[in-house]
Design a protein with these regions (language model features):
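Non-catalytic helical/linker scaffolds that mediate oligomerization, partner binding
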Residues: 1-470
């Protein structure tokens, strides 16, 4: 059973029932909706389609709403676009002007107050780069250090800067409330720089009936990298959004930062998603490049919870083939990774009772050569903690809550299973043993390790470990 989960962005190439069904059967676990594009009406149709397909297939396909995030853009040019040469002087202004080869307006009205001489401004995903020379009233006077073409409404970024404007835009607030109304499972928060950004979204979710929606913080700038521990402490995990991250920090740093962030999330028991350009060539081609295969395999080898498809599944020619390729690469890499040796050689210091129980479950499962670890969980927390140890043993996550059933689809190594509510733990374990036997085709003599807690509807009360022989 594949342990690494697959997230697919839904767009024109995949927003029909036949293709989406094939993607789910090929291995898609989570459907991502990119709210940087499309209207609420368009996204409502996608959500309805995802729900229809997952119900038809009886699969726990989760829905992830990816916010637009704080948006900084240049405005328009009289000619639509201009060419800027390296060494040219160019002005960005918060005033309203008609753009030309020397000046353009920006949509962020605090820009002249946030920037200072020496700061870097990049436009169009780093394709054109400027260094601030002087702030003169409402104007930011710069020198072009990497020439190129500027065109209308291209995005801007400011490496190593945290802007002073509010984190949550009115558009993001509207999108998140829309997501709550339509039952999304995760919100991916773009350009998170600090724990306060996460807390702002948590407050909005809780105030509008979305307390059961989990936040994934997208790490896309230096501040996010530096503050990743406090960010993770306040959300369910992170997405390593390598596209914008490679603009905000030197691109040569991205691989080592990716490994560092993956390791931190694993140790903290948080989900980590590796994203952007993983199989980019499959937008046009039916097979991935060798470099792309290595990229996906290395992320899997490092222990990422999920790998993600963006344009490949949203707008590419081969959305189903992209999912199949991703799944094949992940499965092969997992089969050739010694998870047992990794677990046994990793030093462990328990943080609390639940963490110690989760570690003990993994250790016991290895000792008795168990075919599965079965976690009966109200909130899914115990299953996530067991998952963090990247055990070689299959993990079955049993829950009575459909929301948790879908949420576990983003947890490494966990196969989510829906169960009925049971009158006692003994009855629950009996059902869990029976269901696991069917799912994994267990044979007489096979061992499984079960863990759970008292049947009282509270999360975090896991206190029992049991070995069962089929």
């Amino acid at each position: 059973m594949r342990k690494t989960k697959i997230i697919c962005t839904i767009g024109p190439a995949s927003e029909n029932e036949e293709v989406l069904t094939q993607m789910c059967l090929a291995g898609m676990n989570v459907a991502r909706l990119n709210f940087s594009h499309g209207s609420h009406e368009e996204h409502e149709k996608k959500i309805a389609l995802i729900k229809k397909v997952r119900q038809k297939l009886n699969l726990p396909i989760a829905i992830l709403l990816d916010t637009k995030g704080p948006e900084y853009r240049i405005k328009t040019f009289a000619s639509g676009k201009v060419d800027i040469k390296t060494g040219d002087t160019f002005t960005f202004t918060v005033d309203e002007v008609e753009g030309d080869e020397t000046i353009v307006s920006v949509n962020y009205k605090q820009l002249n107050k946030d920037l200072k001489p020496g700061d870097t401004v990049t436009v169009n995903n780093g394709m054109v780069k400027f260094e601030v020379q002087e702030i003169s009233g409402s104007n930011i006077i710069t020198k072009c250090v990497l020439g190129g073409t500027l065109s209308n409404r291209k995005s801007m970024s400011f490496p190593n800067k945290v802007m002073s404007g509010p984190y949550l835009s009115e558009q993001d607030k509207s999108d998140i409330i829309f997501g709550i109304k339509h039952g999304v499972d995760f919100v991916a928060a773009s350009f998170v720089s600090s724990k306060q950004d996460v807390l702002d979204i948590r407050e909005l979710l809780d105030a509008n009936g979305g307390s059961d929606i989990e936040i994934v913080a997208k790490i896309e700038n230096r501040a996010g990298v530096d503050n990743v521990v406090e960010i993770c402490q306040n959300c369910g995990g992170i997405m390593i959004a390598r596209g914008d991250l490679g603009v905000e920090i030197p691109y040569v740093e991205v691989p080592s930062v990716q490994k560092k962030l993956t390791r931190i999330c694993r140790m903290m028991g948080k989900r980590v998603i590796t994203a952007t350009e993983m199989l980019e060539s499959m937008i046009q081609n039916p097979r991935p490049t060798r470099a792309e295969i290595s990229d996906v395999a290395n992320a899997v080898y490092d222990g990422t919870s999920c790998v993600m498809l963006s344009g490949e599944s949203a707008a590419g020619k081969y959305p189903v083939e992209s999912v199949k390729a991703m799944a094949e690469i992940a499965e092969y890499t997992e089969q050739h990774t010694d998870y047992k040796q990794r677990f046994l050689s990793t030093g462990y210091v328990g943080k609390d009772n639940l963490d110690c129980i989760s570690h003990a479950v993994c250790s016991m499962a290895i000792d008795v050569n168990a075919k599965a670890i079965v976690v009966c969980s109200v909130s899914g927390k115990t299953a996530m903690l067991v998952s963090r140890f990247r055990t070689p043993v299959n993990i079955i996550g049993m829950t009575t809550d459909p929301k948790i059933w879908r949420r576990l689809s983003m947890s490494w190594g966990v196969t989510p299973v829906m169960a009925e509510k049971f009158p006692s733990m003994d009855v629950m374990f009996y059902y869990a043993k029976k269901a696991t036997t069917e799912i994994l085709d267990l044979q007489p003599g096979d061992n499984i390790v079960l863990t759970g807690g008292a049947i009282n509807g509270r999360s975090g009360n896991t206190d029992t470990i049991k070995i069962e022989t089929i």
